[in-house]
């Protein structure tokens, strides 16, 4: 969790990732998909920044672009003030010890032919950490920390439940003692009962190892449970960023308001005004001009249709990309 003296660990500046693709057999002109479009975000050391949005909005692409698992089109990724995108292959290889990822599907991300010990110890062997005996001791220790017994070391992934496999994935990601971890839909494939256990495990490991998380999810309830601050994405751009309490009590962007209105209330006697968005999400091949949300926004004006809104601060720590945010509060 964040301390009072917050320090920015990672920051993106106008980070973009564009893909080129052909629209069809007869259309030979390649089109550009702006999966991530000039995103500027900061993540403070020791905090969890939740990243939410509908499927296809660019959340996972942003996380993987930050880690250089896929190349960026333009922009910067500053880690302790240094641009990761300027690193050569050798320097980036060394840096990867500090940057890790927990994947969504714990089964497909684990090699079915490797034992639990081989899976977790692989990063230690790649970076030549310790002797064989020391590596085994480290693997046994991290396995117990994630709630699994060392008797499982010689078993294979298919012998475990989804929750247990994700614990193995977490152990593998944390074995090198990283500083920054991208959690890419890390609990979305799990049953609800197991999901809470894994979330609590991740919070405990964060406090114990002073980790910083970028927690990617489409589930606002899950993000609320684990995050300190939350960023909302729409069609490759950031719509709103705010501390958790502010975002849920006083959302300023119409898209955020619509998302929050869809969350069920635990008290059946309470009612919340549901905001129904008209139309479908525009195609990433041909996004709207101006504000990308204007085609579904009930408050859109001519300015919204023509001018791209800038992510600006309206309250302390609360940023929103909306021309009419002050009027709609």
Question: Predicted segment positions?
Answer:
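Short catalytic/signature loops enriched in Gly
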Residues: 5-8, 21-27, 32, 243-329
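Helix-to-loop junction immediately C-terminal to a conserved catalytic motif
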Residues: 67
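Conserved ABC transporter NBD signature motif
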Residues: 75-83
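Conserved ABC ATPase "signature" region
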Residues: 83, 133-151, 257-261
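Conserved ABC ATPase signature
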Residues: 156-160, 164
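A short, proline-enriched helix->beta-strand linker immediately N-terminal to the Walker B motif
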Residues: 175-179
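P-loop NTP-binding/switch modules centered on Walker-like glycine-rich loops
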Residues: 182, 186-190, 194-272
């Amino acid at each position: 969790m964040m301390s009072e003296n917050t320090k920015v660990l990672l920051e993106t500046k106008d980070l973009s990732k564009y893909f080129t693709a052909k629209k069809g057999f007869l259309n030979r002109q390649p089109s550009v998909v702006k999966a991530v479009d000039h995103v500027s975000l900061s993540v403070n050391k020791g905090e969890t920044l939740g990243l939410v949005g509908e499927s296809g909005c660019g959340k996972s692409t942003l996380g993987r672009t930050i880690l250089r698992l896929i190349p960026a089109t333009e922009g910067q990724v500053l880690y302790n003030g240094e641009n990761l995108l300027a690193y050569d292959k050798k320097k980036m290889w060394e840096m990867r010890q500090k940057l890790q990822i927990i994947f969504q599907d714990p089964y497909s991300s684990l090699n079915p032919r490797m034992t639990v010990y081989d899976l977790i110890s692989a990063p230690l062997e790649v970076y030549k950490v310790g002797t064989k005996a020391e590596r085994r001791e480290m693997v046994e220790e991290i396995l117990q920390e994630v709630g699994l017994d060392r008797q499982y070391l010689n078993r294979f992934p298919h012998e475990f439940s989804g929750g247990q496999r994700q614990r193995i994935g977490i152990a593998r990601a944390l074995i090198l003692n990283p500083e920054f971890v991208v959690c890419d839909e890390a609990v979305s494939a799990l049953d609800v009962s197991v999901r809470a256990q894994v979330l609590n495990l991740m919070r405990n490991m964060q406090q114990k190892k002073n980790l910083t998380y970028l927690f990617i999810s489409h589930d606002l309830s899950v993000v609320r449970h684990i995050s300190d601050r939350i960023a909302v994405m729409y069609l490759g751009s950031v719509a709103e960023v705010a501390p958790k309490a502010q975002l849920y009590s006083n959302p300023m962007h119409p898209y955020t308001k619509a998302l929050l209105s869809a969350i069920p209330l635990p008290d059946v006697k309470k009612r919340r005004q549901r905001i129904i968005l008209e139309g479908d999400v525009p195609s990433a091949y041909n996004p709207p001009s101006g504000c990308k949300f204007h085609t579904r926004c009930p408050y859109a004006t001519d300015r919204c249709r023509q001018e791209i809104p800038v992510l600006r601060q309206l309250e302390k720590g609360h940023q929103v990309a909306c021309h009419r945010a002050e009027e709609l509060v």
